Amino acid sequence: MAGVDAFLKLDGIKGESTDKSHKDEIEILSFSWGCHSSTSIGQGGGGGVGKATFSDFTFQKKVDISSPKLALIAARGDHIRSAKISVRKAGGAAGQVDYQVYDLEKIYVTGVQISGGDGGVFYETLTLSPTKFKWEYKQQGDDGSLTGNMAVTVDRAANTAQ
């Protein structure tokens, strides 16, 4: 994510970020999530769309102080009460601005995978499954300032989105 920084703030879990706006959060190298909705087009008379299925959030990060605690939470089947993902980029005179923010609730740790070692760096693939999340995207104007936003809230337990 060249020119873009991303941070993960987990309730009760410290990371190693020294960034003044995201101190003690987890620095994210990359992350992904998505949704899929199947249709019945070409399978009979009409056409319809089924309910969407949302994938878990998968993060790539360096192994840090949060890694053992995340593995423990996964092993115990506990959940994390809340989390925030902040994605930022250059904002002109405003400096760095968070232009994408995800607020997650009741999050299960569904995967912790450690790999690497070449050059002494170990990486972690972390998979989180939130029960509910809100994604807010903030549009950036020509001067770099944030000018508008769009948001969606997904409740995976109720299988609803708005």
Predicted regions and their residues:
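Glycine-rich, low-complexity intrinsically disordered segments
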Residues: 1-162
